[in-house]
Structures are given as C-alpha cells and as structure tokens.
C-alpha cells in the first residue's frame, strides 16, 4: 500500500530510458511522424518491444500515480505538515496527464490529429491562460507536432524531475505519514 509512489517513480525511469531510445528514430514532422512510428515498430531492431514497454510504462505510471494520490487522500496523509507536498504531488499528477496527452499526439495519425484539436480546444477554455497555452502549441501541423515533441521530451520531464526531487526531499524531511 505504501509502495505506489515508488512504483510511479519506477515507471518514470522506464519511460525516460525507453523514451531516449525512441527519440533516436522518431521524426517530429507532419510528413514523417507516422512513418517513423511505423518504422520503429517494424524495422528497428526490438523497436516494437521498446515502444510496447514505453506504452505500458506510461499507462502503469498513470494508474500508479492515481492510486497513490487516492491512497494519500483517503488515509489523510496530506494533512499538516504535509500540505505543500500534497500540492506538489497534484502538480506531478497534472504533469503526468500532460505527458500522456502530448505522447498520444506524437503518433500523428487521424486519432492523434483529432485529439490535439480537442485537447487544445479544451485548453483554450482555461480562463486567462487558455489563449496563451493554445498560442504556444498551435501552429501549422509541423509547428504543432514540434511543440508537442519538445513538451513531451524536454519540458514536461524536466519539470517532473525538479518536482520529484522536491517531493522526495519533503518526504525525507517530514517522514511518511502514520497509517490510520
């Protein structure tokens, strides 16, 4: 019951390793993205395995993070003096969802193109920030997929790592909350 945070971190490490391998062959352009994903799956040696591990680790990380947050919430482990750690954890959960969305779009097939339109449409409805977020990601197809690629491969993981370090430091300084 108390290993869900560690399991989430293990999935993240797997995602970083397999993501670096996939990034060597992926082409973030509207013309080459789908073909490069097909090439990774069929031509690159063990590409199907690397892509599969990345896919299942992403799903595992999302499930483990949600279960971890539910456990923290229902056991009351977010209470004083751990409120800031809870806020950081919610930020980590939000970034995990963002990483999943940006990774889904990188396949650049019909589903991904439709999903990015819906996702950016939802993002544009955020009061105050919506137009800024949408203007950053939306452009022509090459710009859009490039922005999602940079977000998925560089920005989101960098912020995730920084918040994880802070999250772990807070756990070390406050200790693990006692069970009910």
What is each of the regions a protein language model found here?
Residues 1-180:
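Membrane-embedded alpha-helical bundles that constitute the cytochrome b-like, heme-associated redox core
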